[in-house]
Amino acid sequence: MCAFVPHVPRHSRGDNPPSASTASPAVLTLTGERTIPDLDIENYWFRRHQVVYQRLAPRCTARDVLEAGCGEGYGADLIACVARQVIAVDYDETAVAHVRSRYPRVEVMQANLAELPLPDASVDVVVNFQVIEHLWDQARFVRECARVLRGSGLLMVSTPNRITFSPGRDTPINPFHTRELNADELTSLLIDAGFVDVAMCGLFHGPRLRDMDARHGGSIIDAQIMRAVAGAPWPPELAADVAAVTTADFEMVAAGHDRDIDDSLDLIAIAVRP
């Protein structure tokens, strides 16, 4: 998941990208279907994705991990810092070639996520971040995750919260999304596939991002999307704020705590295979 593609030139970020490599011979372009690192203009969406990898990577320590839908590969590489093994699968051949060239710690293969190319009970963790909303047969995919997981293995899923991402719409606002979910729908999808102990969290803007929201008409998200759709130039203040976002600017809050899960930006579910 990422924003609509803005009509702006590519810029390299000054901070270090989240990988062991600083250059890639197979460069992915920003299409609106996936987020990529090292672009100031995409930085908000990238950090919103990256924070979930950072917070949940410890659950992959010394485990065999599958990332189903790896996209650019930065997340699989981050997990490879702690995991015993990381296998990454993506449907897009260009993305697979990019991951193979840029992230040598990751074993990557091209496949349909509805037919995962792994044996039964072969991994301890399946990671699926900002991907399930792109799939046509979500139930089949979740059953495939259950198949390849060992007993007591974890399925970790993040996805945009339908209630806040496409408010008041019958269809997703993002043209690359097939079906978006709310917290109850995601929980039911996992339970129906046989998973248990589903823990749900929500991702929210922290104080600094809430200040940015206030500076940009109430929503820094809407400020970006509005200009991207219109092909309009970004005001310097918006560009500077977007480029300054870090993962520390997001809060991950467990459902039932002091924030309503239905108000979250993204949903994060961790489910156990019996």
From Swiss-Prot:
Keyword Ribonucleoprotein among UniProt keywords: no
Class of this enzyme: transferase
GO CC field: cytosol; plasma membrane
InterPro entries the record matches: Methyltransf_11, Methyltransf_Superfamily, SAM-dependent_MTases_sf
EC number: 2.1.1.-
BP GO annotations: methylation
Cysteine-cysteine disulfides: none
Similarity-based family: Belongs to the methyltransferase superfamily.
PANTHER family: METHYLTRANSFERASE (PTHR42912)
Listed name of the protein: Probable S-adenosylmethionine-dependent methyltransferase Rv3030
Origin species: Mycobacterium tuberculosis (strain ATCC 25618 / H37Rv)
Highest classification ranks of the organism: Bacteria, Bacillati, Actinomycetota, Actinomycetes, Mycobacteriales
